[in-house]
């Protein structure tokens, strides 16, 4: 019976636990207490008390018959009543336990329902929060403003920060962060709640709209955002700002300050020059590679002129202006289309600089030559590909269409076969039409559009050569130093040189002499140098006349163009200068010294020509305005003849020093030189008078060693024609009649009017180390040939009076020879005063 009780209790507890699964832990505790209580009841009650247990369940009473009950005797009534009373007590105790357990069950159910209500309330509260797609935080629904144009939602803090960034960077076409729909201005105002930002937003919107208007002109005055919409003002371009207190007058065409009696191009060049000059002075006259690179990082928009910053790292060059939406190329700064980088314009989609002119020309020539081959290859591949590919494509499409449908196999195969057969018939026609139309279009593009567009934009480099025919320029415009990035520029004389920007129209006075022209410098500024013997005269011209003038052209090389051409013509000795007057002022002592040294150095270069002479032409394109120095100078007119006397000293020169100018020969295009006969005579007389000249040199040295100082140069250089025609006459020795020299050894006051400037020691050492014997022999031969025909000459001094001398004139080469042969003497030899004989 005890086993039955335990089994019943476990069954009861098991049923209770099945009803209360959520509180299994609590029910296990109740089971333990129930087992303890039932154990105590069994100890107190009889063994028959457990018979009444089925009555608790209200089940029908059942009798069990066993073998023991048949042989056992019946119980008396007293004992039976006592047993019944004990059974009633057991039933009452079990009912009390059941009631307690039911009460505990109800309490547990009540706690479960309360917890479920709490969870549902919490879940309802969690359901009211939305995650922001920008900051990934959960906010309440009231933190997500509604947008008129799209259904996307973001928190108000993220949207406000997003709008602030967009407006501060002038991006007024603000779209949704998650799609391309633009915000409504009303939504922007509600989200921002900032009057200052909204005012800036409206200003940017208005400016964006006005920029699109072709007749809108903005006032160029600083801190004036007034715009004038001028219709039909092209004929009367003077506009006036209508803002109160401004009244600035500006031009309709160039959109800059009004420039009366001046074209827009001239005014633009003048503004650019003044801007560069201010930049040079403000930056302590220093142009470095970093400053040039920084200037390349900031460029204005070609439509609205809004400045845009881009790192010059070779990234994408297809730019879009944030203010006006203009699409332009960062390299050429022009509005472009999608085909800009596919055409041979020189601009690349990635890169730091466009193609050079040489590369563009080579690409153009390669395209013109290789276009037929390429087009033939494309047509040869396209025709069989279309004939074979079209039927295959049609068959696959029909098969995929009928696949998966309830169509008979025979019907599907019939449709595929019919489609393929039809495509086989049609594909040759399609291929022929495509090739027949595409090939002429490609040929027309290659041979028509590309060359015309390149030549129209100046990219092909073909131009007229000033009556010399068509010329193809292969010099690279990109190699010209912009901003001082490639050239070695001395920073001590840039500002002074800016006052003399034009070589062709003005003078080169006031130059400081710290800049010189070498072969590498001439290559950098685009000088055309010949590989033959014309190089000597080109270098002589560069050394003598262009020395010191690169300080002006190096800073404005974007607008100035220097071309030196050397042409050889038969039986003509002339020097034509189309560049007007070239003069060197009194400030440039060093420049004059270097120029003269360059002329002396280049004079020893032999030329193997018989009866040929050089014509050097200098073409200089510069600005239309000019400055002239006050110092006296020698000049060359357009016809190549000199118009003034040389040797005029400046008023600010110190007295007491002597100098001599170089002798020269006048060369005109209308006279023919008798170089053959005279040269033979001169060569015959050289050998006869060599010993006499040695004696004269020794006598001249002893006479002048204690009287004169070192050979010197005048402060005002001779003209280009005077100096270089002397070189050509020295080379050929053709026209002896035109060489007229004089010698004046008078009083010392004659020499006191000139300033002595020592020549460069580098030139002397170079001559002595390399070829001392050849130089001395050449000088002696020149002296013999020149002094063999003594003629009275006239010298023009600084007062305009002429002086004559009976002694033969000793050239500057005699002074050089004296210096070379007498290096060990304590005093240097002096150079005689040499005047320039000119005809007016």
From Swiss-Prot:
Which stretches are transmembrane? Answer: 368-388, 424-444
What's the protein's topology in the membrane? Multi-pass membrane protein
Stated EC number for the protein is: 2.3.2.31
Enzyme class name: transferase
Which parts of the sequence bind Zn(2+) 6?
329, 332, 340, 347
Any idea which UniProt keywords this protein has?
Answer: Cytoplasm, Cytoskeleton, Membrane, Metal-binding, Phosphoprotein, Repeat, Transferase, Transmembrane, Transmembrane helix, Ubl conjugation pathway, Zinc, Zinc-finger
- Could you give the domain comment from the record? Members of the RBR family are atypical E3 ligases. They interact with the E2 conjugating enzyme UBE2L3 and function like HECT-type E3 enzymes: they bind E2s via the first RING domain, but require an obligate trans-thiolation step during the ubiquitin transfer, requiring a conserved cysteine residue in the second RING domain.
**What is the protein's name according to its record?**
E3 ubiquitin-protein ligase RNF19A
The source organism is Mus musculus
């Amino acid at each position: 019976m005890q086993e039955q009780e335990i089994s019943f209790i476990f069954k009861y507890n098991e049923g209770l636990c099945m009803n209360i699964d959520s509180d299994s832990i609590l029910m296990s505790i109740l089971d333990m207490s129930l087992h303890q209580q039932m154990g105590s009841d069994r100890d107190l009650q009889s063994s028959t008390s457990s018979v009444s247990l089925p009555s608790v369940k209200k089940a029908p009473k059942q009798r069990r018959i066993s073998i023991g009950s048949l042989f056992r005797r019946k119980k008396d009534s007293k004992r039976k009543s006592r047993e019944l009373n004990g059974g009633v007590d057991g039933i009452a105790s079990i009912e009390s336990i059941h009631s307690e357990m039911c009460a505990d069950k109800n309490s547990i159910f009540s706690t479960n329902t309360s917890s479920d209500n709490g969870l549902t309330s919490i879940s309802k509260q969690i359901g009211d929060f939305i995650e922001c797609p920008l900051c990934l935080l959960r906010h309440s629904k009231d933190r997500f403003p509604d947008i008129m144009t799209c259904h996307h939602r973001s928190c108000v803090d993220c949207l406000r920060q997003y709008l602030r960034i967009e407006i501060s960077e002038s991006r007024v076409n603000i779209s949704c962060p998650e799609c391309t729909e633009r915000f409504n201005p009303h939504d922007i105002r509600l989200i921002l709640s900032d009057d200052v930002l909204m005012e800036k937003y409206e200003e940017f919107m208005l400016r964006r709209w006005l920029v699109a208007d072709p007749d809108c002109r903005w006032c160029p005055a600083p801190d004036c955002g007034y715009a004038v919409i001028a219709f039909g003002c092209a004929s009367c371009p003077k506009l006036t700002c209508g803002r109160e207190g401004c009244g600035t007058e500006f031009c309709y065409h160039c959109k800059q300050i009004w420039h009366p009696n001046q074209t827009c191009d001239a005014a633009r060049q003048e503004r650019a020059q003044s801007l560069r000059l201010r930049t040079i002075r403000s930056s302590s006259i220093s142009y470095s590679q970093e400053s040039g690179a920084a200037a390349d990082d900031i460029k204005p928009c070609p439509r609205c002129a809004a400045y845009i910053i881009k790192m010059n790292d070779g990234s994408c060059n297809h730019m879009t202006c944030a203010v006006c939406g203009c699409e332009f190329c960062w390299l050429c700064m022009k509005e472009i289309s999608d085909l800009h980088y596919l055409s041979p314009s020189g601009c690349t989609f990635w890169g730091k600089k466009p193609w050079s002119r040489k590369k563009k020309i080579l690409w153009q020539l390669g395209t013109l030559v290789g276009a037929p081959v390429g087009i033939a290859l494309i047509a040869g591949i396209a025709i069989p590909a279309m004939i074979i590919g079209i039927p295959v494509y049609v068959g696959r499409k029909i098969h995929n269409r009928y696949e998966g449908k309830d169509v008979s196999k025979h019907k599907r195969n019939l449709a595929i076969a019919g489609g393929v057969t039809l495509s086989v018939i049609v594909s040759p026609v399609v291929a022929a039409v495509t090739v027949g139309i595409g090939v002429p279009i490609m040929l027309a593009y290659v041979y028509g559009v590309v060359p015309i567009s390149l030549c129209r934009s100046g990219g092909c480099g073909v131009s007229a050569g000033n009556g010399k025919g068509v010329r193809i320029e292969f010099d690279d415009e990109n190699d010209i130093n912009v901003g001082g990035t490639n050239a070695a520029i001395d920073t001590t004389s840039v500002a002074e040189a800016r006052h003399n920007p034009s070589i062709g129209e003005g003078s080169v006075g006031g130059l400081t002499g710290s800049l010189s022209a070498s072969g590498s410098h001439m290559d950098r500024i685009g000088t055309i140098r010949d590989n033959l013997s014309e190089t000597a005269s080109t270098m002589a011209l560069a050394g003598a006349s262009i020395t010191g003038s690169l300080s002006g052209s190096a800073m404005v090389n974007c607008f100035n163009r220097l071309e030196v051409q050397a042409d050889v013509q038969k039986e003509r000795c002339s020097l034509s200068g189309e560049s007007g007057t070239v003069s060197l002022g009194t400030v440039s002592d060093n420049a004059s010294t270097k120029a003269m040294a360059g002329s002396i150095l280049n004079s020893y270069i032999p030329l193997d020509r018989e009866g040929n002479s050089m014509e050097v032409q200098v073409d200089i394109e510069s600005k239309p305005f000019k400055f002239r120095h006050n110092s006296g100078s020698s000049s060359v007119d357009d016809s190549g003849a000199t118009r003034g006397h040389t040797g005029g000293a400046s008023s600010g020169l110190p007295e007491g020093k002597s100098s001599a100018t170089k002798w020269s020969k006048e060369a005109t295009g209308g006279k023919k030189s008798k170089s053959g006969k005279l040269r033979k005579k001169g060569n015959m007389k050289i050998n006869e008078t060599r010993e006499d000249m040695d004696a004269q040199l020794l006598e001249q040295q002893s006479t002048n060693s204690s009287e004169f100082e070192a050979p010197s140069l005048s402060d005002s250089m001779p003209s280009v024609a005077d100096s270089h025609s002397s070189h050509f006459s020295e080379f050929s020795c053709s026209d002896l009649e035109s060489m007229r020299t004089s010698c004046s050894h008078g009083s010392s006051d004659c020499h006191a009017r000139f300033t002595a400037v020592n020549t460069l020691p580098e030139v002397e050492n170079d001559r002595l180390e390399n070829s001392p014997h050849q130089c001395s022999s050449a000088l002696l031969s020149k002296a013999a040939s020149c002094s063999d025909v003594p003629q009275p000459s006239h010298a023009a001094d600084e007062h305009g009076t002429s002086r004559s001398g009976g002694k033969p004139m000793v050239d500057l080469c005699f002074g050089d020879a004296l210096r070379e042969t007498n290096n060990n003497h304590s005093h240097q030899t002096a150079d005689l005063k040499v005047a320039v004989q000119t005809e007016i």
